Amino acid sequence: HVFEFKPNDLTVNAAWSFLSQRLIYLNGKKICILGAGNIGSKLALKLVESGAEVCIYRRNINRGNIVVNGLNLIKPERTITKIQLYSDAIQASSMADVLIGASSGSPIIDANIVKNLRKECLIVDLGKNNLTGNAIKIATEYSMNIYRTDVTPAMESFVYELLKTQDILKRSCGKKDLGFCNIVSGGYF
C-alpha cells in the first residue's frame, strides 16, 4: 500500500510530543518560535492550546502579523493566552523557557540570540541548520541543551493510525438494528 502523509505535520507532532514529555507541563511555559511558516505556525497553535505562552518571530513582519492574527482567531475561545508577534528575535527569545528554530534551511538562531537566552533555556532545531556554528559553540560553552526532534515516534503512530483506520473501514463498517435502536459503527453512514 501507498499511504499519503504530510511530513510537516509529523514534525509538528514530534516536536509537541517531545516538549510535552521533556517539560512535563506546557501550561505557563514561555516558548519562542523563530520562523512562523507551515511548521512554526502549526506548532504555535498546538502549544498555545496547551496553555503555553507562545511568541513568534518572523523575518517578514507583515506576514507574521497575518499568521499570528489568524492563529489567534482560530484557537479555541477558552484558550486564555494569545500568540504574540515580535519584530526582534532577541527580544522575543530573551525570557524563553524553550527556543525553537523553525526556519526552512537557513540559520535563524545566531550567537547574539544564544548570548541573550536564559541559561536554562532549551534550544530545539526543527529544521536543518537553524543554528549557526557560533550559536552552537556558545550554547555548548554555556552548557545549554540543544535538541533536534526525531519524527520516528510520530511516524510510527501515524502508520498505526492508518492501519487501524484501514481495518475499521474493511471490517467494521455497517449498521445493526437492535429493534429499539440502530447502532452505527465507525466508517460510512
Segment roles from a protein language model:
Residues V48-E49, N72, K115-R118, A139-E141, ...:
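Short, solvent-exposed amphipathic alpha-helical segments in soluble enzyme
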Residues V12, I39-L43, G64, S106-D110, ...:
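Short glycine/serine/threonine-rich phosphate/pyrophosphate-binding segments
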Residues S20-G101:
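Glycine-rich phosphate/diphosphate-binding loop of Rossmann-like nucleotide-binding domains
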Residues F5-K6, L34, Y57, L126:
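Structural motif
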Residues H1-N27, Y160-L163:
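Glycine/serine-rich phosphate-binding loop and adjoining beta1-alpha1 elements at the start
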Residues T81-A154:
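Rossmann-like adenosine-cofactor binding region
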